[in-house]
From Swiss-Prot:
Membrane spanning stretches: 19-39, 77-97, 112-132, 155-175, 184-204, 227-247, 265-285
Protein name per UniProt: Protoporphyrin uptake protein 1
Domain of life, source organism: Eukaryota
Organism, scientific name: Saccharomyces cerevisiae (strain ATCC 204508 / S288c) (Baker's yeast)
Keywords annotated in UniProt: Cell membrane, Glycoprotein, Membrane, Transmembrane, Transmembrane helix
Annotated GO CC locations: plasma membrane
Bilayer topology term: Multi-pass membrane protein
PANTHER family in the record: PROTEIN RTA1-RELATED
Induction: By oxygen and heme deficiency.
Coiled coil (UniProt feature): none
Cytoplasmic side: 40-76, 133-154, 205-226, 286-303
Encoding gene (name): PUG1
Amino acid sequence: MSTTDSGFVLYHYTPSKAAAIVFVVLFIIMTVIFAVQTLYAARKSSKALKNNPFESSDDKVDSLEDAEYKQLKITPTVFAFIPFFTGCIMEAVGYIGRALSSSNPERTTPYIIQSVLLLVAPALIAATIYMIFGRLLHVMRCQSLILISARFGTTFFVVGDVFSFFLQAAGGGLMSKAGSTKTGSGLITAGLFVQVIFFGFFIINEIRFTVNVKRRCLFYEDISRKWIFVNATLLLSSMLILLRSIVRIVEFIQGFNGYIISHEYFIYVFDAVPMLLVIIAFSVGSFFGNVFDVIKECQTLSN
């Protein structure tokens, strides 16, 4: 058991250095692989669309919907992955913190690094999931299939995600201060609840889209099935993060002497593994279909 001078228990065990290093390496490898895949896919699709009117800035548009549709270019979609890769890097750095803690479990700095970064990283990855789903809806012209206003659909989910992020980040910061641990834990729990609620609602919209896309997408019969792999990746990733967040909620409800926080295997089985699987799902899924291919196909068919 590792405690601070104030008596706060940092760890109920000595963190495993080997496990932490393994996940640092895995997160770095998968992040680099998927980053290369993303940039390659974006460049390939961008070249294919270079003579497409949707890539031109002086197009005449007949409606607001057309204007929004033509804004779905390749480059802005690449930017949507920035939160994803930021979250992946935070995961790796978080486990570096755990590796450092294994040598000196009483040090607060590595503890704070791993505690805060591993807590908030999934919220950044979730932001990319929301934005990619929004682009999928727009490019397939299926905005009407979600249960909120099409204009504010993506914004709604991203704002909720940002709110969750700041609640968890603030809570993580307070937990590192003597006398504020309960307040910090409460904020973290609230942030996780917000994340679960928004993810649950998001998954409902994902399923609604999947079930009804055939009758709503005007060029459904002409488009390839690459969008199915994109959608499946988003849905699987959402469920993995949802599972991870639910376990985290239980952890903080149990308190600092609870069973989950007292046993290290929970952080790996229900946090490290699900988040690594999210990156793997995106990487493997991109071989069968990525959002850039879907944008290219839909815009070509709509032209």
